[in-house]
């Protein structure tokens, strides 16, 4: 980790946020994750209301919520990119959190829509058990900064709870 980095806020609990949090924990940094949408269990009900009631929650829907936009997709894991890191490591982590062992050997790995939300829940639970924080229904509304020696740096974020509209700030050494 960078010298002096102790508090890192991650905006969003999609794949980048979840895997970023796990990586920070490996480096001894406990992340604070803020997510605009709901946890997957509540989000599943909110998404169902799109079809049953015709109502769309602007803060928790197919795009926003724990697990990101793909949490309620078909669960296919496919990339042709080889320059973005170790895809095998990602598959191993998915396996660790509950995916079928076949994703480690299949040419086109597939987790399945029914399993992916449970895997995302397991990832959150592990991050919390290791000291990380999760704040659902919490939208980043601004960045905090200060200027020191003519250089501007981020010092945290301002957030708003999407249900209560309560605002607060979260200080951090870094924001992802």
Show which residues each predicted segment covers:
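Conserved N-terminal/central alpha/beta ligand/cofactor-binding core
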Residues: 42, 48-134, 138-139
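A conserved short coil-to-beta-strand element within the FAD-binding core of flavoproteins
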Residues: 136-153
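Extreme N-terminal leader/targeting segments of oxidoreductases
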Residues: 1-6
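Short hydrophobic core segments
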Residues: 8-11, 34, 140, 157, ...
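Rossmann-like NAD(P)H-binding beta-loop-alpha module
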Residues: 78, 154-155
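Short beta-strand "acidic-cap" motif of Rossmann-like dinucleotide-binding folds
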Residues: 29-36, 40
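N-terminal Rossmann-fold NAD(P) dinucleotide-binding loop
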Residues: 17
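Aromatic pocket-lining residues of Rossmann-like dinucleotide-binding sites
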Residues: 23-24
């Amino acid at each position: 980790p960078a010298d002096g980095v102790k508090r890192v806020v991650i905006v969003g609990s999609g794949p980048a946020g979840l895997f970023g949090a796990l990586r920070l924990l490996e480096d001894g940094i406990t992340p604070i994750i803020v997510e605009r949408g709901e946890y997957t269990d509540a989000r599943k009900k909110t998404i169902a209301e799109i079809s049953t009631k015709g109502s769309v929650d602007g803060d928790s829907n197919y795009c926003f919520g724990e697990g990101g936009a793909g949490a309620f997709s078909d669960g296919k894991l496919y990339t042709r990119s080889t320059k973005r890191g170790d895809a095998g490591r990602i598959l191993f982590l998915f396996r660790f959190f509950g995916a079928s062992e076949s994703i480690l050997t299949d040419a086109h790995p597939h987790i399945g829509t029914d399993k992916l939300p449970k895997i995302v829940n397991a990832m959150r639970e592990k991050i919390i058990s290791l000291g990380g924080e999760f704040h659902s229904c919490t939208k980043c509304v601004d960045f905090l900064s200060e200027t020191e020696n003519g250089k501007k740096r981020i010092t945290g974020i301002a957030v708003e709870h999407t249900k209560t509209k309560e605002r607060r700030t979260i200080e951090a050494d870094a924001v992802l």
